[in-house]
Amino acid sequence: MSVKKETRLRRARKARLKMRELETVRLCVYRSSQHIYAQVIAADGGKVLASASTLDKDLREGATGNIDAAKKVGQLVAERAKAAGVTQVAFDRSGFKYHGRVKALADAAREGGLEF
């Protein structure tokens, strides 16, 4: 494993431990080169309450690896989380920089009604 990936995973592990202590529902983001994924995970970490990604049928048609696609995923996960009764979440960026697609997803989720 590369040093860059090890560092990202270490940051993610530390953040998740802190969120586990606080017992909050978290919005977890994973970013690959072609897609972006978002899940709202219960406080105990055992159940996914809502999810969205660029692999969803309605988002798959357009470009999937850009900022516009990340915004659509953020809006969709916010809608699904609100339908599941979740409005307050902790943002888990999985060690990725809060920049570009990750930031676009977070901003769209906030506009969709989720509170971080």
Swiss-Prot record:
Keywords in alphabetical order: Ribonucleoprotein, Ribosomal protein, RNA-binding, rRNA-binding
BP terms from Gene Ontology: translation
One GO cellular component term noted in the UniProt record for this chain: cytosolic large ribosomal subunit
Residues spanning the signal sequence: none
Keyword Nucleotide-binding found: no
Listed InterPro entries: Ribosomal_uL18_bac-type, Ribosomal_uL18_bac/euk
Family label: Belongs to the universal ribosomal protein uL18 family.
Function noted in UniProt: This is one of the proteins that bind and probably mediate the attachment of the 5S RNA into the large ribosomal subunit, where it forms part of the central protuberance.
UniProt protein name: Large ribosomal subunit protein uL18
Source organism of the structure: Pseudomonas aeruginosa (strain ATCC 15692 / DSM 22644 / CIP 104116 / JCM 14847 / LMG 12228 / 1C / PRS 101 / PAO1)
Gene: rplR
